[in-house]
Regions:
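C-terminal hydrophobic helical "lid"/dimerization subdomain
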Residues: 2-21, 208, 265, 311-369
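Short glycine-/small-residue-rich Rossmann-like dinucleotide-binding loops
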Residues: 57, 91, 108, 239, ...
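Adenosine-nucleotide cofactor-binding segment
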Residues: 189-195, 207-266
Length: 369
């Protein structure tokens, strides 16, 4: 029996003719089917902005969302939380943005501004309002335009590379923020576990910040590229001899691997006494990490989690990347080939990050408004 296809949405109105649409999304109408979805927005609210999407990154979190790995999904769903755009319409209360501004937008879309976390500048930990994240009923970057609260847009500085910058608003801040929060100056030797979309960003940040970087990877064929990105040493983690040689050499370790099938103890054994392991890779909600507690206690090793990042560190990251030419390696796809990019992402074959050029399709179809 075929799965039901849902075209009714509580916020966005599906229209049949693209000429009547404000935008077109690639939306999932059920767990397994993605379609081009012309739609109309509600009126822009006083505290909102509508942008024309220029570039949108694809993230593994999109897969987790629409495949319901992280729980029930509201269909139709147009995901995407790595977004570069141009401001098209500004709400009446919005003072910090104007039409034509180039902006970025990421995983967080709103917060309460009042809870104990918000008042400390930790909006990423706010759970006091619904739809904090760009994963729910308010659509994201898989559409030629997007409408969201103004307070989580970020102005882009002159010289910012628009075609490469979208993944910075997820992969970038996910790896930049824990360095801001947890990395101490005396921690000179830093390791990165997993050298994919997140890991290759962590390597670049650590290198530009002046640390010695050790990259842990299973991919022999990435060695030369990782060195160009800033890795001082490459450890092939499936090689027992190399892992043994790396024992107790790392002050600060960033783990980008989300899988619960990983033998974390072999990585923990590489951390110095008093060192830190920062977990940023996020698996399914019921996955667990198995570790040797004796090793943690006897060596006073800290394990810490980090969830994307608040607004101030994101602004700082944007400026840092523009000034230091730190960007992800991306494969670019046209809007028409989002399903192809998504399939490549889901099957673990992108060359670091997939980015979709949204602007060409929008301009060709009269959707830039």
């Amino acid at each position: 029996m075929a799965e039901k296809e849902n075209y009714d949405h509580p916020v966005y109105k599906h229209v049949k003719d693209i000429k009547d649409a404000d935008a077109v999304a690639w939306a999932f109408v059920n767990k397994n089917k993605m379609v081009q979805f012309p739609f109309k927005f509600p009126e822009v609210g006083p505290d909102e902005i509508r942008i024309n999407t220029l570039y949108a990154g694809l993230c593994q979190s999109d897969v987790h969302t629409v495949r319901e790995i992280w729980g029930p999904c509201l269909y139709p769903m147009a995901p995407g939380h790595e977004i570069i755009g141009e401001v098209a319409i500004v709400g009446s209360n919005v003072k910090d943005f104007k039409k034509g501004d180039l902006v970025g937008f990421g995983t967080l879309r709103t917060c309460c501004e009042k809870c104990e976390y918000c008042v400390k500048g930790k909006e990423n930990l706010c759970r006091e309002v619904p739809e904090v994240f760009t994963y729910g009923k308010y659509w994201g970057g898989y559409a030629t335009a997007m409408q969201q609260p103004a307070k989580f847009f970020f102005k882009l500085p002159p010289g910012f590379k628009l075609e490469k910058g979208a993944p910075l608003f997820c992969a970038g801040i996910t790896t930049f923020y824990p360095l801001e929060k947890f990395l101490e100056p005396e921690m000179k030797v830093c390791g990165v576990i997993g050298c994919g979309g997140l890991g290759h960003m962590a390597i670049q940040f650590l290198h530009k910040l002046g640390h010695e970087v050790v990259a842990f990877t299973t991919s022999e064929n990435k060695k030369d590229l990782l060195k160009k990105l800033g890795a001082d040493k490459i450890v092939i983690s499936k090689d027992d001899a190399q892992m043994k040689a790396a024992a107790t050499t790392i002050d600060f370790m960033v783990n980008t691997i989300p899988s619960n099938n990983t033998n974390f103890n072999k990585y923990i054994s590489c951390i110095k006494r008093g060192g830190k392991l920062i977990q940023v890779g996020m698996p399914a909600f019921d996955d667990e990490m198995r570790i040797n507690v004796n090793m943690l206690v006897s060596c006073e090793i800290e394990i810490l989690g980090s969830c994307v990042g608040p607004r101030k560190p994101t602004d700082k990251m944007v400026d840092f990347c523009a000034k230091n030419d730190v960007y992800p390696i991306v494969e670019e796809f046209p809007f028409e080939k989002i399903p192809e990019a998504f399939e490549k992402l889901e099957n673990g074959r992108p060359f670091f990050r997939c980015v979709v050029n949204m602007k060409d399709f929008a301009e060709k179809n009269g959707l830039k408004k």
